[in-house]
């Protein structure tokens, strides 16, 4: 998965010390965490299949910087407060535009600056349009300049090339800076 590779690359290359990553599904949370842990990035998860005790422990370990990354679903992350959280990543674009606001609201709290970054595959553009409509702004999109995905698109099903996203197959993301001015 190119998004997994890009996430691991950005965490390491840009030296992100504490990152909250949002996934649309519980299964997605575990897959992302498995990939990051295999890449040597200490990662925990919180989602609906975890007991309250396990979610509390994972959150405590993330706040205590035992985990560098915490991967969460929207529902499991509602109401959590992490002071001085520098990075939020929308690994999957949220289905509902209001969830985007809740997600990026986890960073840039109490006068601190923070960055929210959204990864987007070609089939998620409809979610971006919904967010832009709600916020009444155009969110900038870019490809990560030092991440080089495979140039040749893979084929699936009937031999047709599968899209890897905009800009010639490079995964795209958007970055929002937040500060409490």
Which sequence ranges carry the predicted segments?
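Intrinsically disordered, Lys/Arg-rich low-complexity segments
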Residues: 150-181
């Amino acid at each position: 998965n190119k998004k997994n590779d890009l996430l691991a690359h950005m965490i390491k290359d840009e030296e992100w010390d504490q990152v909250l990553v949002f996934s649309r599904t519980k299964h997605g949370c575990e897959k992302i965490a498995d990939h990051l842990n295999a890449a040597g990035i200490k990662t925990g998860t919180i989602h609906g299949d975890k007991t309250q005790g396990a979610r509390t422990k994972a959150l405590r370990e993330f706040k205590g910087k035992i985990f560098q990354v915490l991967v969460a679903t929207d529902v499991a992350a509602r109401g959590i407060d992490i002071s001085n959280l520098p990075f939020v990543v929308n690994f999957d674009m949220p289905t509902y535009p209001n969830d985007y606001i809740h997600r990026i609201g986890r960073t840039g709290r109490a006068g601190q600056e923070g960055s929210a970054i959204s990864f987007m595959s070609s089939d998620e553009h409809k979610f971006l349009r919904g967010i832009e409509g709600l916020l009444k702004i155009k969110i900038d999109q870019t490809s990560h300049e030092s991440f080089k995905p495979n140039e040749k698109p893979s084929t699936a099903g009937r031999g047709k090339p599968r899209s890897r996203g905009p800009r010639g197959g490079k995964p795209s993301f958007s970055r929002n800076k937040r500060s409490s001015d």
